[in-house]
Amino acid sequence: RRLKDWRPSGSMEPFRNLRRMYNDAGVKIYAWKQLSTSMSDEEFEYVFNVAEALGCTHTTLELPTDAAQLKRIGDFAAKKKIYAAYHTHTQGNMTAFDQAFALSPGNKANVDFGHYVAAGNVGGSPMQFLEKHHARIASFHLKDRTTPEHCALNLPWGTGETPIKPILQLVSRNKWAIPASIELEYAVPEGSDAVKEVRKCVEYCRTALTA
């Protein structure tokens, strides 16, 4: 309750300082996640003000199923000129975002292509999803998962069934300005660590984009 009361009066200066620190290190913060359908309009204002202070183009949240909330959030995002980008796990498919897109221009997708594959590529492949929806994708997540037929596993990059290289190449070839996040969700091998594994993922992306 105290946090709910504090948010509307919270200072943006710490977030501006955080943005400067990251920018000075060559890192752009393009999104942050705090939005919730249970928030008041005053809390929405706070979330979008933080997004602006951080330099974000969008704020993310799990995809709601309630049409009224999708419209409320999307219209608020459109007013603030910072998109609401909805994230999916294994409920992601070719039509999962259709309702959100139709209800407000402020609604976009933060699609996870690893989870999309783990859900079974319902309605089309990740590349087909990109071809159809690229203008409404604010950002996407990458991990290498297998299909349900192969236990929907999280595996080291290049050993699963998520078409990471074709996804990156399609985005690059079409010059779609869509940022992507590397998500390290497979088990870190013995003798390695998370930093080493993320470096491997970064190199995998570089190889894809220079092929």
Regions found by a protein language model. Name each.
Residues 79, 96-211:
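Histidine-acidic metal/acid-base catalytic patches
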Residues 1-17:
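Glycine-rich, proline-tolerant flexible connector loops at the mouths of alpha/beta enzymes
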Residues 5, 34, 190:
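Second-shell loop/turn segments in exported
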Residues 10, 14, 43, 65, ...:
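Soluble or luminal CAZymes and related metallo-dependent hydrolases
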Residues 15-17, 21-111, 116-120:
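Active-site acidic/histidine proton-transfer and metal-coordination neighborhood
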